[in-house]
């Protein structure tokens, strides 16, 4: 069983605390936010585990992440910490929820986030969570064909991770995306 060192454990705690803080703010400000308030309800911790694994492997920066309403902010937090530059994905997501005019949605819709393709975060562009999975699969296919051949060590190749709930699994686009991935695997 993996036992993180103190520095890694503190980093994980920092990411979890920051992710939980957004959900707490959303719950407290719920009456001021138009439309449904999509909070993590604790499930946001999933994104932190994924991010820690990618960070430990050294492939977080290059990997693609596509979250749903529960994990999008966590993926933003992870990338913020990994890149440690002036681009604050978490703050951008919070501005969207609060309908701030300078947010990427220009104050129009708090339940979408345009992501950040420069940093490998796909948009959370509609409430039909599964619709972005085929896009992620297409981007992953391009990554496999173009970028992977340049990286000799298979353990250092970036990956694409998307998540969705059981409701989205009923959509045909999810089944087709999973079929494409399964058919693409070389045995």
Regions found by a protein language model. Name each.
Residues 1-35:
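Cofactor-/ligand-binding subdomain signature composed of acidic, glycine-rich
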Residues 24-187:
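Cofactor-binding active-site loop characterized by glycine-rich and histidine/acidic residues
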């Amino acid at each position: 069983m993996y036992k993180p060192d103190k520095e890694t454990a503190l980093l994980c705690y920092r990411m979890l605390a920051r992710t939980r803080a957004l959900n707490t703010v959303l719950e407290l400000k719920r009456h001021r936010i138009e439309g449904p308030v999509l909070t993590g309800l604790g499930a946001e911790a999933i994104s932190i585990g994924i991010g820690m694994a990618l960070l430990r492997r050294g492939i977080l920066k290059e990997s693609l992440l596509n979250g749903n309403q529960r994990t999008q902010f966590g993926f933003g937090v992870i990338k913020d910490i990994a890149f440690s530059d002036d681009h604050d994905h978490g703050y951008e997501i919070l501005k969207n929820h609060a309908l701030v005019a300078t947010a990427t949605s220009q104050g129009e819709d708090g339940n979408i986030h345009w992501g950040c393709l420069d940093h490998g975060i796909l948009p959370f562009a509609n409430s039909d969570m599964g619709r972005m999975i085929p896009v992620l699969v297409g981007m992953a296919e391009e990554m496999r064909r173009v970028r992977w051949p340049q990286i000799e060590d298979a353990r250092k190749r970036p990956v694409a991770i998307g998540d969705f709930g059981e409701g989205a699994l009923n959509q045909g686009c999810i089944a087709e995306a999973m079929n494409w991935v399964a058919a693409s695997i070389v045995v």
